[in-house]
């Protein structure tokens, strides 16, 4: 590393040249050198170790949350497979657990359901412990209180946001941040120009929007879309922003995406400026 002028960490998905032709260490090095010379490599951010502890704690909490969801799904699938109605959250609670187990007639099936309940209790205990540890670590960051001031972002979502973004200055604009969070639009267009009476004119054909970008950080997308969903059903300045979009004729699902983009943009701006949330941001900044 003493003789290296610059270290570039690049996205291997975009190095299509490496897939063509023969492959060896020498050939790959030559192709990478050609891509670097032509400025065709796509650099990605390789963060520092300052948030390493929080990142691991967030990953632990997220994994345990996913495990909890899976166990709950298996438990309800067991009841549904025997035509037992199990809507809502009652099948998971300890108060009526014996009543649910008594509805299962087969001894082997009842034993399986009991094992799932034991597994659910154990994972929920671990998840609560992981959550406490994650929140305790996130409180050490000065930006934590600033981001928590944004309505419906909350302690857990703020912890995930800090761990995944690390530093806000890696995103020069909010549109770059939207793309990283899976909130950017993917468009397709062709035949943009045509000849009319010998003159080249731009076609009036509208740009085809395919939807939100697929290559993104899924945790951050869940953070902002979850906050937008909560804000759209509770009173507050964000709900007013959402209602104004509905009044303009925008569909509810598109209005929620717009609200998620707004929350993401505010989080990035407040993080960079070191300021707390002010409802005036909803009026001064364009969505």
What are these regions (language model features)?
Residues 62, 69, 121-128, 261:
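Generic structural signal for well-ordered, non-transmembrane alpha-helical segments
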Residues 36, 58, 113, 161, ...:
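Short alpha-helical scaffolding segments that buttress acidic/His motifs in well-ordered protein cores
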Residues 1-105, 233, 254:
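Phosphate- and other anionic-substrate recognition elements at nucleic-acid/protein interfaces
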